[in-house]
Amino acid sequence: MTYRGYTSLSSHSGPMSIRRSMPLQSSASSISGYGQRMAVSRISRVASLGSSSSSAAGIGMGGVGNQKETMQDLNDRLATYLEKVHSLETGNAKLELQIKEHLDARGPSFRDWSIYEKPLNELRKEVYDMTVDNARLILQIDNARLAADDFRVKWESELSIRQSVENDINGLRKVIDDTNIGRLHLETEIESLKEELIYIRKNHDEEVKALRSQVADSSVHVEVDSAPGPDLSKVLAEIRKEYEGVAQKNKDDAEIWYKNQMDGYKVEVKHNTDELCSAKVQVTELHRQIQSLEVELESLLSMKNSLEGTLRDTELRYEMELQTINGMIAKLEADLHQIRGDMQAQVREYEILLNIKMKLEAEIATYRRLLDGEDINTLVESTSGVTSQTIKKTIVTTQKVVDGKIVSDETVQIN
């Protein structure tokens, strides 16, 4: 949408009369045109007055009667001028009233921006509070991250300790397995020795029985003519005693060796069992600590995720509020720009009307000088040599408005 305002200036080289044509000021234009016509009429009549004065002067040289007629004519013309001055003053008063009404109607209007101060202050306070909350949340997130890093370091150290303890437990299990295998071997050897002892006892009993049977048979059927020999029962008793002593000794040695081996293995098994129990207790304690650390780590991670979500929501809310505030600021700036444009247009219109008023006041002052008794002959002489020349200038002002904003303002003067 484009508005065009035309300003037409008409000037004379002598007394100047300005005619301005404005689309919104038809009454002012008509009054200004009336002032122009009055000025032109005044100049023409003053010129005719000058010519009449010249002719009157010539006639005064020729006769007194013509001078009296000339003075009468001048009095009539002066009365006509006074009537026109009165009508011009009346038109000037009307024009001033219209200018005043126009300025009151289209004067610069100022919007009251104080109503926006309170919501803007509240928004600034909310932005400040949200900034402080955001900084607090960031600090809490950093603290949570540091705590999570500390717990991660502790968890890694506990994990390494757990792995070392598990390695020790596996080594102890291997020792226990080796001990069990050795115990099984010893039990096998003990069983074999028991079987061997039983076999030896059985052989010994069989040999004793055989010897006894031989002794009994020999005592019944054998007749010895020779001298009596050694006592066989005594010999057999000695042999039996000797074999029983050897068997008892072997049995005692085997039992002592087995007892010593079993005592050693029992001590070693007890020691290994104690170590295994302590390792199990340590593993249980480590498992409990690891579980508590894992639970605490999960809680910290969940708190971190919740804080990050809160931070994202807060940043999104801040961004939306900032966009709203920026939109309000842009709207206010657009309104301010439009108000400034309206004020500039009104100032230009006011200057145009002020120029019209000044020109009219100049013409009124001229008429007042006539009324105050200024020498007409001097005025006629000063205006008799004036050549009236009219220069017409047209000023075209083009304003381009898009969405209530003045995009371009171009002024072109056409001669």
From Swiss-Prot:
Disulfide bonds: none annotated. Residues 236-373 are annotated as: Coil 2. Residues 120-211 are annotated as: Coil 1B. Residues 103-119 are annotated as: Linker 1. Residues 67-378 form the IF rod domain. Residues 374-415 are annotated as: Tail. Residues 2-66 are annotated as: Head. Keywords: Coiled coil, Intermediate filament, Keratin, Phosphoprotein. Residues 67-102 are annotated as: Coil 1A. The record marks 318 as: Stutter. One of its GO terms (molecular function) is structural molecule activity. One of its GO terms (cellular component) is keratin filament. Residues 1-25 are annotated as: Disordered. GO terms for biological process: intermediate filament cytoskeleton organization. PROSITE patterns: IF_ROD_1, IF_ROD_2. Pfam families: Filament. It comes from the Eukaryota. Belongs to the intermediate filament family. This is Keratin, type I cytoskeletal 18. It comes from Scyliorhinus stellaris (Nursehound). The gene is krt18.
